[in-house]
């Protein structure tokens, strides 16, 4: 039986106005792939991407923000994008959604204030609100991955389901940007904890990882370094 191909979503991480990739989420260990995030986004759309994942790393770490660049990408490229990084309150989420972003990605705020997720879903609908749980093992990391939260994925997922969340992003921060490949056991655990749409980030290295996701019934992956450096050819074909 042929398994459905998981959706592979190109990621554009934006730091100091450039498209970069971080090693294990460390803002001081960056690789610059494009001097212009707009050029990076345009590159993936030209290759056939129908959806993009943008992360404002400066907003996530409190070092600034890149909202103007993100707004330009949304206006110019004509494909839906989701945006995360520093979306910690209602005003930040509303600003992005009213600017034309297809959906916002809530990270730290979903851990600290799950009610915010429910409020945004009630106002904008579950198709426009996504939660990203960035974790070391099954402990959620917060504030640009710099801190452990003491909250487990197992504790949080039932509350998110109750809030009406449909789509969850899970990132293994210990593998993000490393090309080490996915941890199958961890992926299986998370799949068992979340019964809605599950998108995985962090560690996808090649087609073997895409097959792993298909085998575990995971709907998609956000991929950065592997497609920028060519270890996973894009568009992906198995």
UniProtKB/Swiss-Prot annotation:
<comment type="similarity">
    <text>Belongs to the HisA/HisF family.</text>
</comment>
<feature type="active site" description="Proton donor">
    <location>
        <position position="134"/>
    </location>
</feature>
<comment type="pathway">
    <text>Amino-acid biosynthesis; L-histidine biosynthesis; L-histidine from 5-phospho-alpha-D-ribose 1-diphosphate: step 4/9.</text>
</comment>
<dbReference type="InterPro" id="IPR006063">
    <property type="entry name" value="HisA_bact_arch"/>
</dbReference>
<feature type="active site" description="Proton acceptor">
    <location>
        <position position="13"/>
    </location>
</feature>
<dbReference type="InterPro" id="IPR006062">
    <property type="entry name" value="His_biosynth"/>
</dbReference>
<dbReference type="InterPro" id="IPR044524">
    <property type="entry name" value="Isoase_HisA-like"/>
</dbReference>
<dbReference type="GO" id="GO:0000105">
    <property type="term" value="P:L-histidine biosynthetic process"/>
</dbReference>
<dbReference type="Pfam" id="PF00977">
    <property type="entry name" value="His_biosynth"/>
</dbReference>
<keyword id="KW-0368">Histidine biosynthesis</keyword>
<protein>
    <recommendedName>
        <fullName>1-(5-phosphoribosyl)-5-[(5-phosphoribosylamino)methylideneamino] imidazole-4-carboxamide isomerase</fullName>
        <ecNumber>5.3.1.16</ecNumber>
    </recommendedName>
</protein>
<dbReference type="GO" id="GO:0005737">
    <property type="term" value="C:cytoplasm"/>
</dbReference>
<dbReference type="InterPro" id="IPR023016">
    <property type="entry name" value="Isoase_HisA-like_bact"/>
</dbReference>
<keyword id="KW-0963">Cytoplasm</keyword>
<keyword id="KW-0028">Amino-acid biosynthesis</keyword>
<dbReference type="InterPro" id="IPR011060">
    <property type="entry name" value="RibuloseP-bd_barrel"/>
</dbReference>
<dbReference type="GO" id="GO:0003949">
    <property type="term" value="F:1-(5-phosphoribosyl)-5-[(5-phosphoribosylamino)methylideneamino]imidazole-4-carboxamide isomerase activity"/>
</dbReference>
<dbReference type="InterPro" id="IPR013785">
    <property type="entry name" value="Aldolase_TIM"/>
</dbReference>
<keyword id="KW-0413">Isomerase</keyword>
